[in-house]
Amino acid sequence: MQSPEIVACAVAASLSVLALGGARQQAPNTRSNWPCGGRVDPSYFQVAEGTGGHLFLLAPFEIADSTPLLLAVDKHPQTIFRLAGSITPGVHEFRIPIDGSVESALFSISVQCLQTAELVRPSGALVTGEGVADYATFRAERMTIVEHPETGTWTVRASGSGIAGVMVQARTDIALVGLEFAPPPGTAFKATPVAGVENVVRLRVRGDVQDVEASIVSGAFKTIARLALTPDEGEHAYVARFSPGAGGFRVAVTGRDPHGLPFQRVSAPLFTPR
């Protein structure tokens, strides 16, 4: 059997893509440095993005120890932050709002040539101690799970280069659900936006929230456009109109929880208009 370059592994409702070094394409010394010295097939990166799956850059010998990562992702179904693409050498910081509804938060950093990865509490202290599970034995992946995280702005700090993904997922009552798209008049809703025309987007935020706003963001989590939300039928249900460009995008919603603290939820899949 040929050694696979990529293995796709389904875990419950989520799809996780494990990127492996391929013997048929890499010299022995290159393979030993996988993934930094290897080549990741971009199609598998696209699969992870298009399905909202989790991209793990793992060396072949790390697969046996990856089960806790896969199970942890499945137990944290709501996405708070997601960025994927390539990063340049140097230190990068990402600020993540954690609201009072978050029972458990999963912070994941995957960088092809990972150098450093840190998670900083709102107080400025590095994350350690009780209620923290840290998976830091992988070459290109760092995952930290924090039970009952304090509210406020957390900071993910990473350095390295190459293909990268920074994802924050949570177990929480506040969720972005029912996200659908339709060309006008907005009656035939589907999971995929229609290219070349104005779309009606329909969404609902589940949970006790207020001051809900929404925006279209890129795969690199850059704001593309603000959505002008109009209340729809149902609690915290909204519709808006926008004309998608050719590139992929996500929908991000923000607002405040019952205590007035800011929350953020993001659609995990990267939508590509068709």
Locations of the language-model features?
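Generic structural detector for well-ordered beta-strands
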Residues: 95-97, 145-146, 228, 239-243, ...
